[in-house]
């Protein structure tokens, strides 16, 4: 690119809400484009057709210190939308994942998660390796989204998905496992069952205005200078391009 004035266009479609985008010149912040605050208070009509993205993660489960033979878990599930299933981003970390039978409003999946035998100390790697998806769906605020995971079936409206995140634990299975391995022990606390249960985390959905950013401005580019963009999402993820 020749030095001088140029028109810079930024177009980002992220997997979650964008916090800000930074334009750096020679590794020094030149301009900050703040996206947070531009969409949170927008009103959505009851009959409005909207697009949202939300992340579903699978993992956690029995601690290897207590259950040494419970290192692998296979999951079977599906997602059905009363509307449209627009896109699916795979957030996979290990082998053994499968997405299939994808249609305009549904999909099926087979996932495999692994528990590491590392200590999990705060200075070391985590014992948990999660797998998941980012789903983009379209519908009205009251459109139903059905997530099936193993023997469980969860129903949410898009409106409910946008309110908060949720963790769904396979709690009874954790109790049954403890009884099978250690025998039935009555105790006033249930921490052990909760912490050793397999869990599905459904992160809070965000509307399209949150994860899409378009920006344009004229910049004066200097010869020999390095320019790059750094995108930061509200969930802490960072990406960059130069």
Predicted regions and their residues:
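C-terminal functional module detector
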Residues: 1-242
């Amino acid at each position: 690119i020749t030095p001088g004035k140029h028109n810079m266009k930024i177009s980002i479609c992220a997997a979650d809400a964008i916090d800000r985008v930074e334009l750096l010149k020679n590794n020094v912040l030149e301009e900050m484009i703040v996206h947070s605050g531009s969409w949170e208070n927008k009103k959505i009509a009851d009959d409005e057709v909207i697009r949202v993205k939300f992340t579903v993660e699978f993992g956690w489960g029995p601690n290897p210190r207590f259950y040494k033979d419970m290192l692998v878990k296979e999951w079977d599930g599906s997602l059905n939308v009363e509307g449209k299933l627009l896109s699916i981003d795979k957030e996979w970390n290990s082998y053994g994942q499968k997405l299939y039978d994808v249609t305009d409003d549904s999909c099926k999946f087979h996932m495999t998660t692994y528990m590491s035998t590392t200590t999990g100390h705060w200075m070391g790697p985590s014992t948990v390796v999660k797998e998941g998806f980012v789903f983009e769906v379209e519908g009205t605020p009251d459109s139903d989204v059905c997530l099936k995971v193993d023997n469980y079936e969860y129903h949410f409206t898009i409106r409910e998905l946008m309110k908060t995140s949720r963790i769904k634990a396979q709690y009874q299975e954790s109790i049954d496992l403890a009884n099978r391995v250690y025998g039935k022990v009555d105790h006033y606390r249930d921490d052990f069952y909760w912490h050793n249960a397999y869990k599905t985390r459904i992160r809070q959905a965000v509307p399209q205005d949150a994860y899409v950013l378009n920006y344009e401005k004229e910049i004066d580019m200097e010869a020999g200078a390095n320019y790059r963009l750094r995108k930061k999402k509200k969930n802490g993820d960072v990406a960059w391009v130069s």
